[in-house]
Swiss-Prot record:
Pathway assigned to this chain's UniProt record: Amine and polyamine metabolism; carnitine metabolism
Function comment: Required for anaerobic carnitine reduction. May bring reductant to CaiA.
Protein's name in the database: Protein FixB
InterPro entries given in the database record: DHS-like_NAD/FAD-binding_dom, ETF_a/b_N, ETF_a/FixB, ETF_asu_C, ETF_asu_C_CS, FixB, Rossmann-like_a/b/a_fold
GO molecular function, one term: flavin adenine dinucleotide binding
A Pfam family that the UniProt record links to this protein: ETF
GO BP, sorted A to Z: carnitine metabolic process; fatty acid beta-oxidation using acyl-CoA dehydrogenase
Subunit structure: Heterodimer of FixA and FixB.
Gene name, Swiss-Prot/TrEMBL: fixB
Keyword entries, A-Z: Electron transport, FAD, Flavoprotein, Transport
Taxonomic placement: Bacteria, Pseudomonadati, Pseudomonadota, Gammaproteobacteria, Enterobacterales
Amino acid sequence: MNTFSQVWVFSDTPSRLPELMNGAQALANQINAFVLNDADGAQAIQLGANHVWKLNGKPDDRMIEDYASVMADTIRQHGADGLVLLPNTRRGKLLAAKLGYRLKAAVSNDASTVSVQDGKATVKHMVYGGLAIGEERIATPYAVLTISSGTFDAAQPDASRTGETHTVEWQAPAVAITRTATQARQSNSVDLDKARLVVSVGRGIGSKENIALAEQLCKAIGAELACSRPVAENEKWMEHERYVGISNLMLKPELYLAVGISGQIQHMVGANASQTIFAINKDKNAPIFQYADYGIVGDAVKILPALTAALAR
């Protein structure tokens, strides 16, 4: 048997749902989708869900992962085995851990390849900081996976599809985190997974103020702006959601223009699937040039304005 009898899908990020649903279609005979609202439910059915389970009643001060208990109960009630697919977001990984405990299931994060052999999931993902690919065969009846972006192509909606809708009511967990305040992000979020052109900056850009030079290039060519992990996590120059690498975004754009990025393996795992890589770095021995199709050795602060002016013509 090369498919599961059932697969369960949930995404806290609506833009990741089409990809997860396409993976579900390849891996199971029946697709169940947990959703947070009616609009997401309608989308899930159009993307191939046979059954939609609307999570209902969570107080505003509780976290999405507190639905884990009722989700696990629902999964167990509808089969003695199954596959759970979640995005490899922060919330997706938190939920995966909770579901794994409640279902007594093996959990595998950041899956880049998923297949089924004899009713069991075989998963491949990066190990040793991206230096190798590990393969795991999950032996537990239930398997919980978080899926790296780009693992599956996005499913296409079909408005003629039909499915059944159910409601799963909130049950307060014995131990929960209560949200006391929320703060809006300072910048607009972007869906870098879908970007055709990406300009990505590293610490070689020199300063937070110099990122404006990369932003001007983005405007000139219609690209989205990304960064390396040190820019987001160490320097705090950009948001966490924009950094590319093994522990976050895995991109496949037509063009990846790396500015002041050294090219360590942990970063390149997230960018190496790009159709074309263009690098700008003042260190001619930077590892990035081993991956780049084109490169310029020089100071990015001087090169970016000239490149922007030339491409804006």
